C-alpha cells in the first residue's frame, strides 16, 4: 500500500491513532525519549579551505522547519538553531509566498516560522562559528506564484531586508574556504538567482524516493551511499526520509538506525565524500550524526 503525500498532508488531522497502530505492527509502543547528539558545532573547522563541498559527508534535515501539524506532518523536533548547533549543515526550506514574504510550510501547514526567522538563526550561528557553512535548498511550497514573483520576494529579502551578505550565490560549487560563514543557495525554483540549480544532473545526484515503502527505502539509501563512494564528482544527496505508509517519525524509527549501523559497518569503514544526508528526526537515535560526520576526510 502506498499513501500519496499530498493526500496525507490534506487529511492528516483526520487520521485515527488506532488505525495507524494496526499498520504492520511497526508503530512505536509509546512516546520515546530523544537522545541528544554529540556532534560538534564546529566540525567543519577540521577541514582544509581547499576541500570541495562535494567531498564532504554532510548531515542534513528533510523539511527542516516542519515541527508542527501533527503526526503525519511533523518531520523535526529540533529548531533550526538546535539543528545547526548539533552539526546539521543542510537545510531544506519550503516557502509559501504570502503578503510579500515567505512563510515556512509543510504542505498546507504553516510552521509558525518565517524565512526571516530561518535567516536569523543561520546568521547568528555562523557569526558564532565562522568555520562553518550552511547549504540551503529553497523551494516553493503551498503557493503557486510564478517564478518572477517568487524571485521578487527573494530579492526583497536580499536587498531591502539586508540579507545579501549572508548568502553565497554562485554558478558552481565553491570550495569550503569560500563558503565559510555563508549560506550557499541551492535554488529549487526557476526564478531564484545563481547557477546551483536543484536537480541539475551536472551538479547533483539525488536519491529522494519519498514514496518508497519503509522496507523498500533502505536499499535505495544504502545503494546511493555506495554510488557516492564509487563515483565521486557531483553533489550526492541521499534522503533517508520517506513519506510512504507511515508517519515520518515512525519511518525514522526504522531508517535512522539502519543508516547509523551501515555507516559504522566494516563495509563503510574509511569511506569519505558520501554527500548530503537529509533525515527526519536525526535526534531520535544516539550516535547517528556522529556516524555521518565520521565519513569526512581526516586532517
What are these regions (language model features)?
Residues 1-19:
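N-terminal secretory signal peptides and thylakoid transit peptides that target proteins
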Residues 11-14, 32-86, 100-114, 118-128, ...:
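Long, acidic (Asp/Glu-rich), low-complexity accessory segments flanking structured domains
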Residues 22-35:
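C-terminal region of N-terminal signal peptides and the immediate post-cleavage residues
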Residues 55-58, 89-93, 134-138, 183-187, ...:
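Structural recognition of the beta-strand scaffold that forms the well-ordered cores
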Residues 95-100, 105-170:
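Metal-dependent phosphodiesterase/phospholipase catalytic core, i.e.
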Residues 143-145, 192, 244, 284-285:
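Short acidic, S/G/P-rich loop/turn micro-motifs used as interaction or catalytic elements
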Residues 149-157, 198, 288-294:
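Short, aromatic/basic amphipathic alpha-helical patches
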Residues 165-271:
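Surface-exposed substrate-engagement region within the catalytic domains
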